[in-house]
Amino acid sequence: STPPPSSAVSGSPEPGESPAPAGPIAIAGASDFDPETDGGNDEENPDAVAKAIDGDPATYWETLRYKNRPNLGGLKPGVGVVLDLGEKRTVTAVELMLSADNPEDPTSVEIRVPEGSKPSTRTEADWTVVGANDAAKGTVTIELDTPTETPYLLVYFTKLPPTENGYKARLHEVTVDAIPDAELVVE
């Protein structure tokens, strides 16, 4: 019998060719994430959030300053930035350029994807952790546990480095790596 014709997406590599590696993609937009349900006030420096995706490492978005403890003062599980990728993309890694008053002080950060097709702003529980770094400092790459198709990502800070009179994290730039669409094979 004759094998069925291949149903690979046009532009897929021929047998024996290596697929193109994942690479940086454009980020369509960003918004702050501080749900009231989680103890927040629905606002975490929203006016500065675009600086995390503006391509200028000298600018940044930062969390508010939290007192007493690095885990956001014990007030909430975390805060972060929601990234709009413009469409579903198969994400493999997220690179973060972070800074702290002391460059040796680490930040705990997670990469999450929404449970549904829309980015929830109601609670962090509506997002699934797909990668994390509990000792992030400087420029770090967080590889996702498995390549994940999603139109949105949440960069979620759960423990902040010390600053004067408290704790605060700064996010200078975010780069998202994804597999080129032409490399996806439809079975």
Name each model feature, range by range.
Residues 2-86, 102-103, 182-187:
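Disordered, acidic Ser/Thr/Pro-rich linker "stalks" and the adjacent N-terminal cap
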Residues 25-30, 61, 109, 129-131, ...:
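Generic hydrophobic, helix-prone segments enriched in Leu/Val/Ile
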Residues 58-122, 144-187:
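Aromatic, loop-rich ligand-recognition surfaces of beta-strand-rich domains
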Residues 122-146:
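Extracellular carbohydrate recognition and processing domains
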